[in-house]
UniProtKB/Swiss-Prot annotation:
The gene is MT-CYB. The cytochrome bc1 complex contains 11 subunits: 3 respiratory subunits (MT-CYB, CYC1 and UQCRFS1), 2 core proteins (UQCRC1 and UQCRC2) and 6 low-molecular weight proteins (UQCRH/QCR6, UQCRB/QCR7, UQCRQ/QCR8, UQCR10/QCR9, UQCR11/QCR10 and a cleavage product of UQCRFS1). This cytochrome bc1 complex then forms a dimer. Keywords: Electron transport, Heme, Iron, Membrane, Metal-binding, Mitochondrion, Mitochondrion inner membrane, Respiratory chain, Transmembrane, Transmembrane helix, Transport, Ubiquinone. GO terms for biological process: mitochondrial electron transport, ubiquinol to cytochrome c. This is Cytochrome b.
Length: 379
């Protein structure tokens, strides 16, 4: 008799994805972030569901409903802070996952990579809308500033902004639709992530060497399930340390002031995980130019496979590309820092230089380094 896990229509899918899946024997801890992202998504959906039970999407009561969750609901404070800081953990894992893909050349699997970019855009949109829901000062002004960027689109811009707002300004209609979208999008992300996984399992995983591993595969369970559980424990430890000791570390104090359309905060800025893109947006004095640079800063990932010039897949044996990659990481950290600073000298010029550096490394220097390394192979 065939084992039920291999014959049952539903259990068979789980078996082929997480148990008997042939996996390269040499994948490192950098391959843990995919499973951690899945865990983060489930955690966000669960905590978000419980928050939605007590939240009201009305401009007059939204702020007080969040306060009510923290003060009066049983363990409401931990649910709220797990959700808020869970988003930060989500983006840490997301950026590590993308970084791993760029370093080891995982972008050579085009379907998986492009669906990943779609996922990134969707997660960013979801996180942005979630930040608006507590209806604090930074929620309101962040929503106003970011949605207003759509007005830079020629001809249809102004109409588009008013259509998104549901009126002439960010108000009740905006909050209600953002709540509705923020609730539905994680389920869409879950569906798209399943397709992401489906395409990955069509080709099989990449590995640190960048070479084919068909001759050296091991079952996913128990080897990588155990490895993933270790990653999960470390993730939960970090999240709980953040939630229980300094839950507001990554938040903005301005968001503890109820939204007031008549009073603009001195420094409007998004959550920390969007600061690098915000710095790129601000580094261009022209509105349309800034919006284009902001969009390109993420869309540039779709160009990475086209700009691959090296004969080798990953950067494991490519020292020049490695230096450029870590320079890119430092550049992104610099942009993140600049995004949180006021628009004044010397921050403006540092932001502009870091933005030029960001696009130069990906579009010019990395393809050149690939060509140089190809020639070095012939020495």
């Amino acid at each position: 008799m065939t084992n039920i896990r291999k014959s049952h229509p539903l259990i068979k899918i789980v078996n082929e994805s997480f148990i008997d899946l042939p996996t390269p024997s040499n994948i490192s801890a950098w391959w843990n972030f995919g499973s951690l992202l899945g865990i983060c998504l489930i955690l966000q959906i669960l905590t978000g569901l419980f928050l939605a039970m007590h939240y009201t999407s009305d401009t007059t009561t939204a702020f007080s409903s969040v306060t009510h969750i923290c003060r009066d609901v049983n363990y409401g404070w931990i649910i709220r802070y797990m959700h808020a800081n869970g988003a930060s953990m989500f983006f840490i894992c997301l950026y590590m996952h993308i970084g791993r893909g760029m370093y080891y050349g995982s972008y050579t699997l085009p379907e998986t990579w492009n669906i990943g970019i779609l996922l990134l855009f969707t997660v960013m949109a979801t996180a942005f809308m979630g930040y608006v829901l507590p209806w604090g000062q930074m929620s309101f002004w962040g929503a106003t500033v970011i949605t207003n960027l759509l007005s830079a689109i020629p001809y249809i811009g102004t109409n588009l902004v008013e259509w998104v707002w549901g009126g002439s300004s960010v108000d009740k209609a905006t909050l209600t639709r953002f709540f509705a979208l923020h609730f539905i999008l994680p389920f869409i992300i879950l569906a798209v992530a399943t397709v992401h996984l489906l395409f990955l399992h069509e080709t099989g995983s990449n590995n640190p060497s960048g070479m084919t591993s068909d001759t050296d595969k091991i079952p996913f369970h128990p080897y990588y399930t155990t490895k993933d559980i270790l990653g999960l424990l470390l993730l939960i430890l970090m999240l709980l340390l953040l939630v229980l000791f300094s839950p507001d570390l990554l938040g903005d104090p301005d968001n503890y002031t109820p939204a007031n359309p008549l009073n603009t905060p001195p420094h409007i800025k998004p959550e920390w995980y969007f600061l690098f893109a915000y710095a790129i947006l601000r580094s261009i004095p022209n509105k349309l130019g800034g919006v284009l640079a902001l969009t390109l800063s993420i869309l540039i990932l779709a160009m990475v496979p086209l700009l691959h010039t090296s004969k080798q897949r990953g950067m494991t044996f490519r020292p020049i590309s490695q230096c450029l990659f870590w320079l890119l990481v430092v550049d992104l950290l610099t942009l993140t820092w600049i995004g949180g600073q006021p628009v004044e000298h010397p921050y403006t010029i540092i932001g502009q230089l870091a933005s030029i550096m960001y696009f130069s490394i990906i579009l010019i220097l990395m393809p050149i380094s690939g060509i140089i390394e190809n020639h070095l192979l012939n020495w």
